[in-house]
Amino acid sequence: MIILAATPIGNLGDVSRRLLEALGSVGIIAAEDTRTTIHLLSALGIENRPRLIPLHEHNEDARAGEIVALGREQDVLVLSDAGMPAISDPGFPLVAAAAAAGVTVTVIPGPSAVLTALAVSGLPTDRFTFEGFLPRKGRVAYFTGLAREPRTMVFFESPNRLPAALADLATALGPDRRAVVCRELTKLHEEVRRGTASELAEYFAEGARGEICLVVAGATPATASLPDGIGQVLALVAQGVRLKEASAEVAESTGLSRRDLYEGALAAR
């Protein structure tokens, strides 16, 4: 059996009884970082010393078959460094391979940065989408593509890129789009900062430290205004996108007329 198990995202007290039992008895652990797993076993006072198999983004495709074969004969515990395996962490190829081979996969649920950030954000939680890590480049175009997304959106971002990401968010989705920066969740210096995109961009202009989750409100049903749309087109053009292509992209995401956007942006240049 393959067992995906969630580990703490910052507070060791969040370890579940089921995880403790599994760590104390399992013979094999597939770990994102074996050093992190060894530290976890030591911190929890676990005397069991299972076989540790590295399973990370660079080898998970190649290692999946081996681990599935082991899971056919005995329990294999799968751990990421923090949170739930397969959620923006190694695990998906392994689960897919196990399912295809008819090997049972189960879960020991627990901490999740995505759900923790969503729950504490104060933004609607009935419908949401997790978008993973923001791209390093082309974020204005990326955010513009999400301009009409009605669901609350959750992203991961590095602390070093957070100021630029928030500025791009304000440019693409408007300065008044509601958002929440969740920093160091469940840890000693946890911070949840709510505000508009422009307010958060100003607050974090000098950067931030720690693990970051960014939660962004979905689009309201109201149609975007033409001036806002023209502003989005000009922002894309400033990123190197051709005016015609930028107008088409914003028209697709906002429902505004491509011709009106093109002519308005042309006049504003």
What are these regions (language model features)?
Residues 1-5, 72-80, 128, 151-155, ...:
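Generic beta-sheet signal
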Residues 23-29, 102-105, 152-153:
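Short active-site oxyanion
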Residues 75, 152, 156-269:
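A contiguous loop/helix-start segment that scaffolds small-molecule binding in enzyme catalytic cores
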Residues 93-149:
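Class I SAM-dependent methyltransferase SAM-binding "motif I" and its flanking Rossmann-like core
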